[in-house]
Amino acid sequence: MKETRDLLFYNENSIDFNFSPEEMDTHQMMCVNNDSQQDTSFLTATTCIFDFQKDIYDDQNLMSFDPFFPQQRDMALWIASVGNGAIDWSTKPQLTLSKKIPDVVNEKGEEITPADLQRHYADKHVAKLPDHSCDLYYLLFKHAKFEATTLRIPLSLLNDNGTGALGPFDEIRSLTDEEQRLLTLLKTISHYSWVTKHATKDCTGQLLDLCKEGLQLVESIQVNKTFNGVILHILVAYFGRRSTALRDEFQLHKLFLEQRLDIELEILAQHGGADAIDSEKLRKVKKLSELWEWFNAIPYNHHPSVSQIEFIASQIGEKVSFVKSWVANKRRTGAKKRSKKPAPSTQIRPALKVFLEKKPFVSRQVV
């Protein structure tokens, strides 16, 4: 379990929040159309909205304190398009990190600066979470030391004394059943994506199925013209992109795991002898049925807790190591048998020898 914890939670000191101007440019969100009338381009404009905004802006730059917000110059238009009575950013479009934000206070009633917001966000959400390449994981999963189970945002710091509104985040409180289902789907997809990338086991089938389901739900809501709020706009852009962009990557990863499993089974057959192939165990390994059951047991209306994620990850580790430990055990028992009867051939093809010499899991480079 300790290895699982190390895998799930990186040391916060290893995350560097300082970026060059070039790197910052790559994380800028797409701008909302400046036309006063809302049009369908708004949907495509959110395509990059999940590119996690971990940049630390200086006072010369406009500040976007949360990944859900576009750049400050588009704030008024964006919020107006949502139409939820949010803070009127049109009167203060050029806020800097050091200037206090009027009417936006913390729990003590003190006006705060954008720098305070960023510091709060980084302390509570970024430094304590896994690999910073997983933008959705930051946004959509709670942490053991930060108990709220909705989107990871500092709601207490976004209170408007004048209206009592929380800006676009009021949308979260009034989601329809379909919208809540989509949001939960997104959480689950984020988890599967992170596990596939970092916890050494493939979730290709689940990811593709969830993406398809999410896209179908979005299309259904659009047809019925019942979609409301910025959350659904984000989901439209996300599912439309994710369902196609991940397919090739996950199919390749799935193919790699299937090939690896075939190789391990071949090694087992070579070194354990025919009597080592127990049909019941072979079925469990071949189908990895127990692994899928662990994931499918997560109900869609429940947000996985950290302890659940750790538990599932530990189960994944056990399933992955099952074949290797089984092979090792059969090798030991096979060595005893060889003293009594002729030993089977111990020659290994070069490809298998190379495979055995590799580390258990091949790290995947994050693009």
From Swiss-Prot:
Superkingdom classification of source: Eukaryota
Transcription is among the record's keywords: yes
SUPFAM superfamilies given in the database record: Homeodomain-like
GO cellular component: nucleus
DNA-binding region: 273-338
Keywords: DNA-binding, Homeobox, Nucleus, Repressor, Transcription, Transcription regulation
Stretches that traverse the bilayer: none
Subcellular location: Nucleus
One of the record's GO molecular function terms: DNA binding
InterPro entries in alphabetical order: HD, Homeodomain-like_sf
Subunit comment: Forms a heterodimer with A1.
Function: Mating type proteins are sequence specific DNA-binding proteins that act as master switches in yeast differentiation by controlling gene expression in a cell type-specific fashion. Transcriptional corepressor that acts in conjunction with A1 to repress transcription of haploid-specific genes.
Family: Belongs to the TALE/M-ATYP homeobox family.
Protein name: Mating-type protein ALPHA2
Source organism of the structure: Yarrowia lipolytica (strain CLIB 122 / E 150) (Yeast)
